[in-house]
Amino acid sequence: MIRFLVFSLLILTLFLTAPAVEGDVSFRLSGATSSSYGVFISNLRKALPYERKLYDIPLLRSTLPGSQRYALIHLTNYADETISVAIDVTNVYVMGYRAGDTSYFFNEASATEAAKYVFKDAKRKVTLPYSGNYERLQIAAGKIRENIPLGLPALDSAITTLFYYNANSAASALMVLIQSTSEAARYKFIEQQIGKRVDKTFLPSLAIISLENSWSALSKQIQIASTNNGQFETPVVLINAQNQRVTITNVDAGVVTSNIALLLNRNNMAAIDDDVPMAQSFGCGSYAI
């Protein structure tokens, strides 16, 4: 009897101390600093399995089986209210989120697949009336990304909106969420711009938007360059601090050496390209090129 009790207590201890899900990362707005936000984004990048590194940039895996394909991000606002966000670790796409006993998923095939593995114990599942690409989100929000503030206070507001699910502002909140997590993980410049706004908001420059819209193209050309003496097969156009279009043709460019932090696997390009808006606008910025 005593042995049984000891064994039972041991099992219970192991259960209580085990991590919830491998790869989970968390960020709390209360007491947040530029440094703590940077640690959060660094931990998010570390939670993404990669195939190998090209020019010291992790190349994300092309696929993973079942639940291994997803990781959770736990975000807590100033009011101590938490939402859990599910991402696809092969492309850092947000699939949906959970607030309390309710899960919310984008209206797309990839999110439907994710729902088989994450938030399965939620008592209620809501399918959002739009997919997760920016074009659809901007239509639902009635505004473009350039007019939606970013910064840690904006992230706090986004968490609150999603926690209580305000349908009128959910699409805008999701764009703030995506840029504050996925896009910041993809680009050091976006991480830095958001992280240094601890107590104020800012409107994203069109240069930020151009980086976001160019992730697939840059990833593809960097992979091509790895077997082409560092040269791009097709140039990628970005914008410099003088609001001028700059053509990136090789891996010596600053956006490659000191900005992009993750590479989308070429095997996943078709699905991502389908989600990039056809019309891309560009503007000024200060990232290294």
Swiss-Prot record:
Q: Which domain of life is it from?
A: Eukaryota
Please verify whether the record's keywords include Signal.
Answer: yes
Proregion span(s): 271-289
According to the UniProt entry, where is the signal peptide? 1-21
GO function terms (MF aspect): rRNA N-glycosylase activity; toxin activity
Which transformation does this protein catalyse, written as a reaction? Answer: Endohydrolysis of the N-glycosidic bond at one specific adenosine on the 28S rRNA
**EC number(s) on file:** 3.2.2.22
Q: Which Pfam families match?
A: RIP
Q: Which PROSITE patterns does the UniProt record give? A: SHIGA_RICIN
Q: Which UniProt keywords apply?
A: Antiviral defense, Hydrolase, Plant defense, Protein synthesis inhibitor, Signal, Toxin
- InterPro entries, alphabetically? Ribosome-inact_prot_sf (IPR036041), Ribosome_inactivat_1/2 (IPR017989), Ribosome_inactivat_prot (IPR001574), Ribosome_inactivat_prot_CS (IPR017988), Ribosome_inactivat_prot_sub1 (IPR016138), Ribosome_inactivat_prot_sub2 (IPR016139)
Cystine crosslinks: none
Active-site annotation:
183
* GO process annotations (BP): defense response to virus; negative regulation of translation
The similarity comment for this entry is: Belongs to the ribosome-inactivating protein family. Type 1 RIP subfamily.
The record's function comment reads: Abortion-inducing protein. It inactivates eukaryotic 60S ribosomal subunits.
Kindly provide the name given to this protein in its UniProt entry. Answer: Ribosome-inactivating protein karasurin-C
Species per Swiss-Prot/TrEMBL record:
Trichosanthes kirilowii
